[in-house]
Each structure stands twice: as C-alpha cells, then as structure tokens.
C-alpha cells in the first residue's frame, strides 16, 4: 500500500509503498477515503522536541481520518465490511481515576492512533474495533 511514512527521526516524510497491513483479531482494517492534517501532525513532520517522546520511526502518522471497513477481525463485533466509519483515534484505558470519573480525554494511559502507533496517512489503517 502507499502511505506517508515518517522513516527517520528528522524533519520531513516520504510517500512510499509499504507492506500491506495485517489486522489483529480485535481490529478492523479501514480503506482510508479522507484524512486531515491536524496541528499535532506538524511536530511529527517537523520533528520538534515533542515528537521523539511519542512517535517511533518508521511509521505512518495521521490521526484524523475516515473510510470504509474492508476487513473485520475475528473477535471484532458490531462492524461489517462496507461500513463507513470515522475514527476516534484516542484510545483510553477506562481504568484510571480520570476515566472512572468521566474525564477520558485526560486519561493518563491515553494512546493515539497515528502518534503512538501507525495512523491514517495511508491507503489503509488498522484500528481497534
């Protein structure tokens, strides 16, 4: 597949062909139709002082995207091939004090698709169902 790949810990990115994604049983594979550039993508592209703390190269970035489901993992529920989806890229733990008190947006264990793992600046993206 083609993807915008951050190959090295330096400014810039490259549009390249990468290996096809394989999903885990609890994930869905999304054929990305649209992705947007967010302010948090800029530090990754420019490789400022924040980027090395969170983003590991090589990887695809981008956390705001939508598309259609092209594959459903064996244990994923409530999704089917062809569903149009918009991705909630912030994955919270559900267990910490903040999550237990309705403040998931400040979860201490928050992981972000496209920051802490591969994202949506490619033809396909694998995301938790």
What is each PLM-predicted segment?
Residues 10-15, 39-40:
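Short N-terminal binding/cap micro-motifs at the start of the first secondary-structure element
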């Amino acid at each position: 597949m083609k993807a915008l790949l951050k190959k090295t810990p330096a400014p810039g990115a490259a549009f390249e062909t990468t290996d096809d994604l394989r999903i885990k049983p609890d994930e869905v594979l999304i054929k990305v139709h649209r992705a947007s550039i967010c302010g948090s993508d800029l530090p990754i592209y420019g490789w400022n002082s924040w980027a090395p703390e969170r983003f590991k190269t090589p990887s695809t970035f981008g956390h705001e995207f939508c598309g259609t489901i092209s594959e459903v993992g064996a244990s994923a529920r409530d999704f089917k091939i062809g569903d149009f989806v918009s991705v909630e890229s912030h994955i919270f733990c559900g267990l910490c004090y903040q999550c237990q008190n309705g403040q998931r947006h400040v979860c201490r264990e928050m992981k972000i698709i496209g920051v802490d793992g591969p994202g949506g600046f490619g033809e396909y993206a694998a995301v938790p169902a």
